């Protein structure tokens, strides 16, 4: 049997609050259309996608909005704009599915993480999600705390 390869992708940015603030539905993997300095800046791991979202334009294209990829320090006059809208690359059928999902009440497209795959390409994991209300967030917190407590009790009793 061949030795099992471990995960080869490197996470550049992660939206950890998304799973707390939203009920995550279907997830998609999309490519990112980036400039050279954006790729180099992403590799430093200082990008922020916590306040970002994706939207489908009338032309049938999907854009990542409000994501911050800081300027690359070694690039001088050829640097990029940190908060520009970035095009996401998906199949047309997937874009149609996302557009139909956002037309439903309360659904939005949320980025979960940006990573580099095993071929060195920048990819983004996006999800169709519905925003949680305050009581749902409290319920999630209670369940997580109870699961932790159960784990502690099971370890103590052995």
From Swiss-Prot:
PROSITE patterns: SSRP. This is SsrA-binding protein. It comes from Methylocella silvestris (strain DSM 15510 / CIP 108128 / LMG 27833 / NCIMB 13906 / BL2). It is found in: Cytoplasm. Required for rescue of stalled ribosomes mediated by trans-translation. Binds to transfer-messenger RNA (tmRNA), required for stable association of tmRNA with ribosomes. tmRNA and SmpB together mimic tRNA shape, replacing the anticodon stem-loop with SmpB. tmRNA is encoded by the ssrA gene; the 2 termini fold to resemble tRNA(Ala) and it encodes a 'tag peptide', a short internal open reading frame. During trans-translation Ala-aminoacylated tmRNA acts like a tRNA, entering the A-site of stalled ribosomes, displacing the stalled mRNA. Keywords: Cytoplasm, RNA-binding. InterPro entries: SmpB, SsrA-bd_prot, SsrA-bd_prot_CS. Pfam families: SmpB. Residues 133-158 are annotated as: Disordered. NCBIfam families: PRK05422.1, smpB. One of its GO terms (biological process) is trans-translation. GO terms for molecular function: RNA binding. GO terms for cellular component: cytosol. Belongs to the SmpB family. HAMAP family: SmpB (MF_00023).
């Amino acid at each position: 049997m061949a030795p099992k390869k471990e995960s080869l992708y490197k996470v550049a940015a992660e939206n950890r609050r998304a799973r707390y603030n939203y009920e995550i539905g279907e997830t998609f993997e999309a490519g990112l259309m980036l400039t050279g300095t954006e790729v180099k800046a992403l590799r430093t791991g200082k990008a922020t996608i916590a306040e970002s979202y994706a939207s489908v334009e009338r032309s049938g294209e999907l854009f990542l909005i409000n994501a911050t990829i800081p300027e690359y320090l070694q690039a001088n006059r050829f640097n990029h704009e940190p908060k520009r809208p970035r095009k996401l690359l998906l199949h047309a059928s997937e874009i149609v599915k996302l557009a139909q999902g956002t037309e439903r009440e309360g659904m939005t497209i949320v980025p979960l993480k940006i990573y580099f795959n095993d071929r060195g390409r920048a990819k983004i994991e996006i999800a169709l999600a519905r925003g949680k209300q305050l009581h749902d967030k409290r319920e999630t917190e209670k369940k997580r705390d109870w699961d932790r407590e159960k784990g502690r009790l099971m370890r103590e009793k052995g």
